[in-house]
A protein has these predicted regions:
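Auxiliary Fe-S-binding modules of radical SAM enzymes
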Residues: 1-156, 358-437
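N-terminal [4Fe-4S]-dependent radical SAM core
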Residues: 105, 110-189, 206-210, 214, ...
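Core AdoMet radical
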Residues: 186, 190, 206-263, 269-288, ...
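Short cysteine clusters
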Residues: 195, 199-202, 246
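Active-site beta-loop-alpha junctions enriched in small/polar residues
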Residues: 249-251, 282-284, 305-307, 345-349, ...
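Alpha-helix-loop-beta-strand connector modules within alpha/beta enzyme cores
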Residues: 258-274, 323-338, 392-417
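Catalytic cores of alpha/beta
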Residues: 287-294, 349-366, 428
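Conserved strand-turn element in the central/C-terminal portion of the radical SAM core barrel
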Residues: 317-319, 329-356
Length: 437
C-alpha cells in the first residue's frame, strides 16, 4: 500500500504535496505514523491550512518524525503551514493533523482532521458514520433560499425567532436554520441568550484573547408566542422528518428559559400533534427539564464531551451545577420515556482512552441511552489537549472506531450516527454497522 504523502501550505494558503515525506497524524499528545484508516477526501470536505502550525512528516527511509520548518517551491523558501481537512455531515474524525505550534494564534473553531495525499488525490482519517442523506450539503444554500426566507419574513414580519434564523441561514449557512425556510426535517428554534456554562470551545461566546467565536449569540430572547408561531408552522407543514429543536449554536442554554419554552410547547401542541419537539441542552437543570417534559417535550439531546466528571467540568466550566445534575436530568428524561440522545463531542486521543470509554459505556448502559450522535469537537486541538491534561485525561487513545465498537457490543440497542432520529425512525434497527465504510 502506498502511504499518503505529507501536505503543507504556503503562507498564502496554497496546499502542496511534499515530494518525499509521508503524512503523520496526531492522537492526543502523540504524533504517529498511522497504519490504516484513511479514505478519499469526501465530497464537500475541504482542505484548510493551520496558521502558526508547522507540519510534521515521516521520513520514509528511517520511519522517524521530521519537523518541516522550511520549504522550497519554485526557487523560493518559506515557512510552511500544516494542513487539515474539514469533513461534511455524516463523517466522524478519527485522527488529528500532525502538527506542532510555532507561536501562532489559537486556531478558529473547526474540527481539524488529519489529511494527506494518496495515489488518487487527497485522503483523510475518518469514518462514515451516518449514510442518511437529508443533511447532504447540496440540499442547502440553494438558489431558491433567499426567496424562501423572504416569504417567511413576509408571513411573520415581527417575529424575532425568524429574524435570528435569517442571520444564521445566510451568514453562517446553518442547516438547521435553513430547514425552517425549506419547511423540512429538523428546524431550529433559538430561545436563550444566557448560559450557565463557560465551555472552552463555545462557538457563540469567547473571552478576550480566545479563539474568535464562529457565531454571534442571540442578543434578545424571543417570547413564547414567537417561538410557538414558528414551531407550530414548521411542524404542521414540514416535509420529511418533521421536528423542531430548542437549543442551537447561536444561543446559550435553553433550560434557562424553561418557562417560556414550556408555554410555547403547550401552544404548539394545542394546534398540532405532528412531528417531534426536541431540546439540545447541557441538562444542567432537572427541575426546568421536568417542566418541559410536563408540557409535551418528547426528545432530549444532551451535549457532553465526557462521562468522566473531572474532564466534563474542566471543559464545560459549569456555573451553578455539577456533573451529578446532568445525570439527574438523564435519569428524569429516561423515567419520563423521552427519547434520550447524547450529543457526544469526540476528540481523538482523549475520548477513546480506556478510562473515557469505560465511563461512557457505563453511562449508556445505566440509563439505556437511545442514541449517541457523534460530533467532532470544534476546537484548536492543542487548546483541548491542555484542558485534558489539567483534568488528568491524557491517557493513550485506542482509536475512535474501537470506541464505537465497544459501545455497540455493550449496548446492542444503541443507535450510533450523526443525525437526529425522527419519531418513526426511533423504533428501527440501530444505524451502526461494524464496517463503517
Amino acid at each position: 500500500m502506498a502511504w499518503p504523502k505529507l501536505l503543507f501550505s504556503s503562507p498564502g494558503g496554497e496546499v502542496m504535496e511534499h515530494p518525499t515525506l509521508l503524512a503523520s497524524v496526531r492522537s492526543g499528545d502523540r504524533l504517529l505514523h498511522p497504519t490504516d484508516g484513511f479514505l478519499p477526501l469526501p465530497r464537500h470536505a475541504r482542505l484548510v491550512h493551520l496558521p502558526g502550525r508547522l507540519p510534521v512528516g515521516i521520513d520514509p527511509s528511517s520511519g522517524r518524525l521530521r519537523l518541516l520548518d522550511e520549504a522550497q517551491v519554485g526557487g523560493k523558501s518559506f515557512t510552511p503551514q500544516a494542513v487539515g481537512a474539514l469533513l461534511p455531515p455524516g463523517y466522524t474524525r478519527t485522527l488529528l493533523p500532525g502538527e506542532v505550534k510555532a507561536g501562532g494564534p489559537i486556531l478558529p473553531q473547526w474540527a481539524y482532521t488529519a489529511a494527506g495525499w494518496g495515489i488518487r488525490g487527497p485522503v483523510t482519517w475518518a469514518l462514515r458514520t451516518d449514510r442518511r442523506r437529508h443533511w447532504s450539503p447540496e440540499r442547502f444554500s440553494t438558489a431558491e433560499l433567499p426567496r424562501l426566507i423572504s416569504a417567511h419574513r413576509h408571513r411573520f414580519p415581527e417575529n424575532r425567532v425568524l429574524a435570528q434564523l435569517d442571520i444564521c441561514a445566510r451568514a453562517y449557512r446553518c442547516f438547521t436554520s435553513q430547514n425552517i425556510f425549506y419547511l423540512r426535517d429538523e428546524g431550529a428554534i433559538p430561545a436563550s441568550s444566557s448560559c450557565n456554562a463557560r465551555c472552552v470551545g463555545c462557538i457563540s461566546d469567547q473571552p478576550a484573547g480566545g479563539a474568535p467565536a464562529s457565531h454571534a449569540r442571540l442578543s434578545e430572547p424571543p417570547s413564547a408566542r414567537e417561538m410557538a408561531e414558528i414551531g407550530e408552522f414548521h411542524l404542521s407543514n414540514a416535509r420529511g422528518r418533521a421536528m423542531i429543536s430548542f437549543g442551537q449554536g447561536c444561543e446559550g442554554e435553553p433550560l434557562m428559559r424553561s418557562r417560556a419554552i414550556a408555554e410555547a410547547i403547550v401552544a404548539i401542541r394545542a394546534k398540532t400533534s405532528r412531528g417531534s419537539i426536541n431540546i439540545n441542552s447541557n441538562a444542567s437543570l432537572s427541575g426546568a427539564l421536568k417542566a418541559l417534559l410536563d408540557s409535551g417535550l418528547d426528545a432530549v439531546r444532551i451535549s457532553l464531551n465526557s462521562a468522566n466528571p473531572r474532564l466534563y467540568e474542566a471543559y464545560y466550566q459549569p456555573r451553578g451545577y455539577r456533573w451529578q445534575d446532568v445525570e439527574a436530568s438523564i435519569a428524569l428524561a429516561r423515567e419520563r420515556r423521552a427519547y434520550v440522545a447524547l450529543n457526544l463531542l469526540l476528540f481523538p486521543g482523549v475520548s477513546d482512552s480506556a478510562r473515557e470509554v469505560r465511563a461512557l459505556v457505563q453511562l449508556v448502559v445505566r440509563y439505556r441511552i437511545d442514541q449517541v450522535q457523534t460530533r467532532s469537537l470544534c476546537i484548536d486541538p492543542l487548546q483541548y489537549l491542555e484542558v485534558a491534561r489539567r483534568a488528568g485525561a491524557n491517557e493513550k487513545g485506542n482509536g475512535i472506531e474501537q470506541m464505537l465498537s465497544r459501545l455497540r457490543s455493550a449496548a446492542p440497542w444503541l443507535k450510533i450516527g450523526n443525525f437526529a432520529m425522527a419519531t418513526r425512525e426511533r423504533q428501527t434497527a440501530p444505524l451502526y454497522a461494524p464496517a463503517f465504510g
